[in-house]
Amino acid sequence: MGIPLRIDARSTALVAVGGAVGAVLRYTVAQAIAGPLGTLAANAAGSLALGALAYEAAATDSVLSADAHTLLGTGCLSAFTTYSTFAVQTAGLAPRWMAANVATTYALGFAGVLVGRAIAATARGDRR
């Protein structure tokens, strides 16, 4: 499943360009929604998008090229989502909010992947 690993100048450039776009988008979200809620929003949205992208990548007749998957998945969405910020922000919360933030982040992350897959499946006309 997924895209085969390619380490060459082209795929490295695609990851760099996608990463730059994802980082700017992540920064924009952080400016619009400060603190743990902004991180939660970025991670949930990124999970949804990556769920759709991964579903599409797994299709034998994917409409996106391997380059597009590298640019969007490994580049853009990897830079957009952030586990390290989530961990640091969670550690700074009061204990009861720590548990709530962890539970909410994982619940929305998994739900986002499932919803993203469902959206991609519907767009493809799949019934799996």
UniProtKB/Swiss-Prot annotation:
- State the Gene Ontology terms under molecular function: fluoride channel activity; fluoride transmembrane transporter activity
Which catalysed reactions does the entry list for this protein? Answer: fluoride(in) = fluoride(out)
A single Gene Ontology CC annotation of this entry is: plasma membrane
Q: Which Pfam families match?
A: CRCB (PF02537)
- Keywords on this record? Cell membrane, Ion channel, Ion transport, Membrane, Transmembrane, Transmembrane helix, Transport
Cystine links in this protein are: none
- Note whether DNA damage occurs among the keywords: no
Compartments it resides in:
Cell membrane
Q: Which residues cross the membrane?
A: 13-35, 40-59, 71-93, 97-119
The processes (GO biological process) annotated in the record are:
cellular detoxification of fluoride; fluoride transmembrane transport
Q: How does it sit in the membrane?
A: Multi-pass membrane protein
InterPro entries according to UniProt: FluC
**Which HAMAP family does this entry report, sorted A to Z?**
FluC (MF_00454)
Q: What does this protein do?
A: Fluoride-specific ion channel. Important for reducing fluoride concentration in the cell, thus reducing its toxicity.
Protein family: Belongs to the fluoride channel Fluc/FEX (TC 1.A.43) family.
Q: What is this protein called?
A: Fluoride-specific ion channel FluC 2
Q: Which gene encodes it?
A: fluC2
